Amino acid sequence: MSMSQPSIDFSASSVDVARSLIGATLLVNGVGGRIVETEAYDHDDPASHSFSGPTRRNQVMFGPPCHAYIYRSYGIHWCLNFVCRPAGHGAGVLIRAIEPLVGLDIMRKRRGLSDERLLCSGPGRVCEALGITQEYSGMSIDTPPFQLTPPLDPVPVVTGPRIGISKAKDVPWRFGLAGSPFLSRPFRQPDIV
């Protein structure tokens, strides 16, 4: 009897994908760790880049699921999103934080600091630590340089409002690994899902 590897269905809703990514392991060129924080965005969500329809900047969000959508936030930091829902829909999941596990020396060098809790605790920090830039946008995340392994066992997940946005701030589409010290920001009165 063979054991099948758990998988994440990227054609599902962004909320379901965001929740199922918590506890998954993400490596980029062999560097990375466990995903501990995500946020979901959908085409009918005023906080989503896809809300006003396809543009040159967000066209990857409207492509096939299971691809990387990279954009620059505030003209400074790269941010990594995973496209979900069927092509043409315009949905994604922002990777907000990971627990660094593999390639810590490389991450420390890229980030210029040693505190493991700060290496990947925020979307810009994730991209800097993992060496992710615009050139990765549109790449499939189920082939190198990406390696995504779903969690083998269920993990405790908390949810709450998304952060760092000006619209739809109360929508509880931020997900985190309960008790993780590697979150970008603690959850205020989190709900356990």
Swiss-Prot record:
Report the Pfam families cross-referenced here: Pur_DNA_glyco
Keywords attached to this Swiss-Prot or TrEMBL record, sorted alphabetically, are:
DNA damage, DNA repair, Hydrolase
GO MF, any single term: DNA binding
Lineage, top-rank taxon, reads Bacteria
What EC number is given for this enzyme?
3.2.2.-
What GO terms describe the biological role, i.e. biological process, of this protein? base-excision repair
Q: What class of enzyme is it?
A: hydrolase
Which HAMAP family does the entry link to?
A: 3MGH
Please state which protein family the record places this protein in: Belongs to the DNA glycosylase MPG family.
Q: Which NCBIfam families match?
A: 3mg (TIGR00567), PRK00802.1-3 (NF002003)
Q: Specify the protein name.
A: Putative 3-methyladenine DNA glycosylase
User: Which species is listed as the source?
Assistant: Nitrosospira multiformis (strain ATCC 25196 / NCIMB 11849 / C 71)
